[in-house]
Regions:
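Hydrophobic cores of alpha-helical transmembrane segments in multi-pass integral membrane proteins
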Residues: 1-6, 17-36, 49-74, 84-115, ...
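Short amphipathic alpha-helical coupling elements at transmembrane boundaries
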Residues: 39-42
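Membrane-lumen (extracellular) interface motif
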Residues: 9-12
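Membrane-interface helix-loop-helix junctions at boundaries between adjacent transmembrane segments
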Residues: 45-46
Length: 180
């Protein structure tokens, strides 16, 4: 977790070491990601509700991983530390990579545990509403962070260019909530 502390005054040698290690973690993560893709590659993939949530997880995890590479580079990390970019990265890596597989697992295992099938059509609606809502909520936060919006802000002055993207993120959170 030291790579989240690049702006705390660590010595240059420690910064270089943890930046390199943060970049190196992309290798096993990339292998893991491509192993998931290859697992589906030659199979007959049916886009059932559990598979939709799985593919949604893969896309969200990919974007979280790409932003992780970005924040492992010191100059960029210093520019976006304590901004909405970090909030968006965290939510893509942690929330998206946890919530979507859990929902997929519920849709997969619940019929096996209860003996009653869940409604496939409602499940697909739930997935698409959640997926669109999640990305409407957190993707604009990347841009807001690059524009300088700090995290833990409850209000801000007009004219900073954050209004529209912040409103989109707020609407996205409502959409995401409706999907769950």
């Amino acid at each position: 977790w030291v790579h989240h502390m690049f702006a705390t005054g660590l010595p240059p040698l420690a910064l270089a070491f943890f930046s390199a290690v943060s970049l190196l973690i992309t290798i096993p993560s990339g292998v893991q990601f491509f192993a998931w893709i290859v697992t589906m590659w030659k199979g007959k993939v049916e886009l059932t509700v559990p598979m939709l949530f799985t593919v949604g997880f893969l896309l969200i995890f990919l974007l979280g991983g790409i932003t992780g590479v970005m924040v492992s580079i010191l100059p960029f990390d210093w520019a976006v530390t304590d901004s909405y970019f970090i909030v968006a990265h965290l939510h893509y890596v942690l929330n998206g990579a946890v919530v979507f597989p859990i929902f997929g697992a519920v849709y997969y295992w619940m019929p096996k545990m209860t003996g009653k099938m869940l409604n496939e059509r409602l499940g697909k609606w739930s997935f698409w509403v959640m997926f669109v809502g999640f990305n409407l909520t957190f993707f604009p936060m990347h841009i807001l962070g690059v524009l300088g919006m700090p995290r833990r802000v409850w209000t801000y002055s007009n004219g900073l260019g954050w209004d529209t993207l912040s409103m989109i993120a707020s609407i996205g959170s409502v959409v995401f909530g409706l999907g769950t």
